[in-house]
Regions:
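Amphipathic alpha-helical segments
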Residues: 17-32, 79-85
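N-terminal beta-strand motif that seeds the catalytic metal site of vicinal oxygen chelate
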Residues: 1-22, 67-71, 114-126
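Conserved short beta-strand elements that form part of the metal-binding/catalytic scaffold
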Residues: 31-67, 107-114
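Vicinal oxygen chelate
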Residues: 15, 51, 64, 69-107
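Short secondary-structure junctions
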Residues: 29-38, 85-93
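A generic structural signal for short, solvent-exposed coil/turn residues
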Residues: 1-3, 25, 38-39, 48-50, ...
Length: 126
C-alpha cells in the first residue's frame, strides 16, 4: 500500500536567464518568485504557492521548452511499478526521483513527498 498525488507543475524553459523566465511566469500567474524557498536554487525558481495547491516551479533546461508534472509519493518504487503497469516507461532514474514517459509521449517525474499535509488529497493504492 502506498499513496500518491499531483505534486507540481514545472515550466521547463530553454533559456540562459531563468530569472527573467520566472519573472514572466510569476507575473502571468499572479505568483511572485519565492526567493526563500529551498527549491529556488541553481536553475530552479519556485513561485509562491498556497500549501494546499501544487507547486509551480520554473526550471532552466537544455531541451525544448515544455511543461511537465511531478507525482509525489511515499513509495517511489511502488509508484513506478504501478505506472509501468499502466504503460509508462522509465526514461531515467536519478538519486531522488524517476523520469518516466507516458504511453502518449509526455514525460513526468515521480518524486518523494515534497508538499505539506501528505497524504491529504492523495490516492491510496493497495
Amino acid at each position: 500500500m502506498h499513496y500518491s498525488r499531483l505534486c507540481a507543475v514545472l515550466i521547463d524553459c530553454k533559456t540562459s536567464d531563468v530569472d527573467e523566465a520566472a519573472r514572466f511566469w510569476g507575473e502571468a500567474l499572479g505568483r511572485p518568485v519565492d526567493p526563500s524557498h529551498p527549491g529556488t536554487r541553481g536553475g530552479y525558481r519556485m513561485l509562491e504557492t498556497p500549501p494546499d495547491e501544487p507547486i509551480v516551479q520554473i526550471q532552466r533546461v537544455n531541451h525544448d521548452s515544455r511543461v511537465h508534472i511531478d507525482i509525489e509519493t511515499d513509495d517511489i518504487p511502488a509508484e513506478v511499478t504501478r505506472l509501468g503497469k499502466l504503460g509508462a516507461k522509465v526514461v531515467d532514474q536519478l538519486e531522488r526521483w524517476v523520469v518516466m514517459q507516458a504511453p502518449t509521449g509526455q514525460r513526468f517525474c515521480v518524486v518523494r513527498v515534497q508538499r505539506p499535509g501528505f497524504p491529504k488529497n492523495a490516492k491510496r493504492w493497495d
